[in-house]
Amino acid sequence: MKIITFKCLIVLKLLFIILKVCAEQQEGSSASDPEVQYIADKPGWDRAWTHAALEPLYNTSLYPDVDVFRARVRFPSALGIANQLRKYHLNSTRVKRGTAVVVVRAGTVYGITFEDFSPAFRIRLDSVVSELQRYQDGGYIKLEDTVFILNTRDVPVCTLGYCLAPLFSYIKDIRNGRPYSDDLLVPLMSYPFEKLVDYPLDKKIPQGVMASYMDEAVGTESTCRSLVHRFARADVAGDYIKILDSELLTATSKDSRDRSAAKVAHVSGIVAPPPPPDQLVRYSLVMSCDYQTANPGLASLLHTNSLVLKGRSSWYEYYYRALENGVHFVEFEPGFAEEEVKDALKPGAQAKVRAMVEAAQRFAYKYLSQRSRALFFEKAISEYNKLFGPGYMKATVADLPADRSIQMRDIMALKMYPSSWRQGLA
């Protein structure tokens, strides 16, 4: 009986904490706050809507990823897309359920999956297909015929020479500037952020804030999310760091979002869609901690006029290598989160803080729109095709059936014609 009573007390205490957090958020809700401004067009600021404007991202991310494969000499039998799928993806249920193939033929984009493809990853494949098609139809990009493998999972696949052919992924493992996976990074198209988000500086709450699902796994005691949660609950650090419920942020936001998709992603165990930033921007500092992979919400935080504090991590998205610590954001060691927040709030630091905030917003405004992401994808496909030699991909796509829908068995049966890349000449 005593054990049951003790358990009941614990449950009631947890319920009280959750209700308290929800009440605090609703009290400070910005859903009706007219001073939160979404800015679609910023006079004097540029968008990277040409390949020339995107060269900084190509130089830091795309070209290095492609060069890994350009420098390799492989035996002809080891280079086929079908061989890559057959030898590795079919031998791991976990990898297979997140593996898709994207085909572009005569300007039309197709997504093909295995029969047991996980529904949780469907939004990531569908968003690539639909967004590339939208910008292709709008005349903003011109996609070459191609066939490529897309990894929709939260982790890279091409570790320790795992990939014999380039594989498009959203996440890469990079430590001390050295890649530990060979995935070719491409943009995540499923969570668009197009607008800057501003809030009056003199009305910002002088705290660091992080969005988090209240029932999410925060990892071991030494992880960034776990430590920030612990600081937020502490008597002293709690005055400087606050945790907001991501689900409540989404429910009360002015920004309409697909909440059912967020629920599916959260329940399925993949990183859930990040909440809109219109409540987070009300704080002086916004904090980003990775989950078991890169936090997709970092892009939205960079759009705000709050300083971004990013927990140190080895997970990278396609644009991370173009960001600079101390220029666009402040990187912090999770165990020193409280000290970083205090330092950034000091009066003497505000000139530097404002400069970093503007640099971050300019970066996000210029490089992270959906149109810029679609252009990056177009360039990635072009560079990928070059690896196989002139005309190779066009001939490969021509082998696919034209009188019915393309299926995975058609990809597995592709003829692997010789190419200059296979012969080690590229």
Language model features by range: what are they?
Residues 14-30:
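N-terminal signal peptide
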Residues 6, 15, 142, 200, ...:
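A generic structural signal for short, solvent-exposed coil/turn residues
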Residues 25-268, 274-275, 400-402, 414-421:
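Secretory-pathway glycan-assembly enzymes, especially type II membrane glycosyltransferases
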